[in-house]
Amino acid sequence: MFRHPLAGIQLVEGTVEASESPADAARRELFKESGLDTKQRLFFIGKNTRMVCGQIWYFYHLDLLCTRNQSSHFAPDDGGIELQFYWHALLAPPPPDCGALYARVLNYARPQLLRRLQL
């Protein structure tokens, strides 16, 4: 998760461009918003057409080893902004300052991830 200085708590997400697959879009958005450039396999965990009317949301899981609990990334969008990243426990409820959309996303993704991780 990350804290956007103007928009609050968010998750990495974005639009699938016409020339790319949903997995390629996920990888591109991950790099753009977090600076993580990975060639590791992304695991598809779900597709949802009810998050936002008229949109298809694709969900991916990435196995990632990380030694830091928090980090920041300068994203060039919107004139350049600093995003504060942190890990959110899988079984924890959405943070109280998380917007309703991202709370729904977390609540949708949690059981998909638990199945994927066989927890």
Predicted segments, located by residue:
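A generic structural signal for short beta-strands and their flanking turns/coil linkers
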Residues: A7, Q40, I56-Y58
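The catalytic Nudix box helix
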Residues: L11-F44
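Nudix hydrolase/Nudix homology domain
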Residues: A7-I9, P76-L119
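N-terminal strand-loop-strand
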Residues: M1-V12
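Short connector loops at helix/strand junctions that flank enzyme active sites
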Residues: L11, Q55-W57, G80
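Active-site-adjacent beta-strand/loop module that shapes the phosphate/pyrophosphate-binding cleft
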Residues: T49-F74, Y86-L91, V105-Q112
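Hydrophobic residues at beta-strand termini and immediately following loops
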Residues: F2, I45, H88
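Conserved short-loop catalytic and cofactor-binding motifs
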Residues: E13-G14, N48, P93
